[in-house]
């Protein structure tokens, strides 16, 4: 969820900018502050200009790709985050100054941007072959998280003595989002950026049905991992969809690619800046000559 949180981080402020008028924002013994005054002050700040950029990009993305992102898709991704973080989900939202509604708004914004990337990224067979070299199918594992190494070692001893992994996960794991599922987590591959790198490295070494024989130290504590499903790689033609997804996901993390895509989207969006003080707000994407021609 971290990428989503940083993606369109100023979305909440956007509503403030959109609601300008002569209404009073605050009153003091020295006088009142109106929305117009607030806007005039805010628009000249870096954060204010960033908000306007994001609002414009969101508007044109919604117009061009809105029909490709359903409410169901947004809800599905939202629920995956909720399941992933379990009981800590609300506190994570709160610490990032977000609500359920604002998170869903950001998820939609990111999905719209991904649709733009997909539409503008022509993937060749050579691209697929290159991606295939490092491709490994998603694996499914179960894990037991504890705070002490000695506890993890005791769990491994119980497994060696024939203990049931699912029962041990429910008994010992401190991960509230997975313990009642026997420690099972969503399938992942090497491109997953939310899992600890030590966790992934240890997991990929396991054969199906095997578990780690020593505790795995991660940023969360100590983990015992069991491989549940490890599909064979198979043929490239069987994984075209997954390969394209990997390429698109990589592009979503590449600033040069995103800048190029957003530039194309904005040019197609017929954007006109009406406020002369903000005429250069899109220079990052359209260049000074394009922005200065707006009225």
From Swiss-Prot:
Q: Which Pfam families match?
A: Rotamase_3
Classification via InterPro entries: Foldase_PrsA, PPIase_dom_sf, PPIase_PpiC, PrsA_foldase, Trigger_fact/SurA_dom_sf
Q: Where is this protein localized, as stated in its record?
A: Cell membrane
In short, the EC number is 5.2.1.8
> Please, which domain of life does this record's source organism belong to?
Bacteria
Q: Where is the lipid attached (S-diacylglycerol cysteine)?
A: 20
The record ties this protein, via Gene3D superfamilies, to: 3.10.50.40
Signal sequence bounds: 1-19
A single GO BP annotation from the record?
protein folding
Lipidation annotated as N-palmitoyl cysteine: which positions?
20
Topology versus the membrane, per the UniProt entry? Lipid-anchor
Q: Could you tell me what reaction this enzyme catalyses? A: [protein]-peptidylproline (omega=180) = [protein]-peptidylproline (omega=0)
Q: What is its main location?
A: membrane
Q: What GO molecular function annotations does the UniProt record carry, in alphabetical order?
A: peptidyl-prolyl cis-trans isomerase activity
List each copy of the PpiC domain by range.
136-229
GO-annotated cellular components: plasma membrane
HAMAP family (UniProt xref) = Foldase_PrsA
Q: Read off the NCBIfam families from this record.
A: PRK04405.1 (NF003356)
Q: Family assignment?
A: Belongs to the PrsA family.
Function text = Plays a major role in protein secretion by helping the post-translocational extracellular folding of several secreted proteins.
Output this protein's name. Foldase protein PrsA
The lineage is: Bacteria, Bacillati, Bacillota, Bacilli, Lactobacillales
């Amino acid at each position: 969820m971290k990428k989503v949180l940083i993606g369109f981080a100023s979305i909440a402020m956007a509503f403030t900018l959109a609601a300008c008028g002569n209404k009073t924002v605050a009153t003091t013994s020295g006088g009142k502050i109106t929305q117009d005054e607030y806007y005039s002050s805010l628009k000249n700040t870096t954060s204010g200009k960033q908000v306007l950029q994001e609002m414009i990009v969101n508007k044109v993305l919604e117009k061009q790709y809105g029909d490709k992102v359903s409410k169901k898709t947004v809800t599905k991704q939202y629920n995956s985050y909720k399941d992933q973080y379990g009981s800590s989900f609300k506190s994570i939202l709160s610490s990032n100054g977000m609500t359920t509604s604002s998170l869903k708004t950001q998820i939609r914004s990111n999905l719209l941007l991904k649709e733009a990337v997909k539409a503008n990224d022509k993937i060749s067979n050579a691209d697929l072959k290159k991606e295939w070299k490092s491709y490994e199918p998603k694996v499914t594992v179960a894990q037991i998280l504890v705070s002490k190494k000695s506890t993890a070692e005791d769990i491994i001893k119980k497994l060696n003595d024939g203990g049931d992994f699912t029962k041990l996960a429910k008994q010992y794991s401190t991960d509230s989002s997975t313990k009642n599922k026997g420690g099972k987590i969503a399938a992942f591959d090497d491109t997953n950026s939310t899992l600890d790198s030590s966790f992934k490295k240890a997991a990929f070494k396991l054969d199906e049905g095997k578990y780690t024989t020593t505790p795995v130290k991660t940023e969360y504590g100590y983990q015992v991992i069991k491989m549940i499903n490890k599909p064979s790689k198979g043929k490239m033609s069987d994984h075209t969809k997954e390969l394209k997804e990997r390429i698109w996901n990589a592009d979503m993390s590449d600033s040069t690619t995103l800048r190029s895509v957003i530039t194309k989207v904005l040019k197609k969006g017929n954007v006109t800046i009406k406020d002369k003080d903000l005429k250069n707000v899109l220079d990052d994407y359209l260049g000074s000559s394009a922005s200065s021609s707006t009225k």
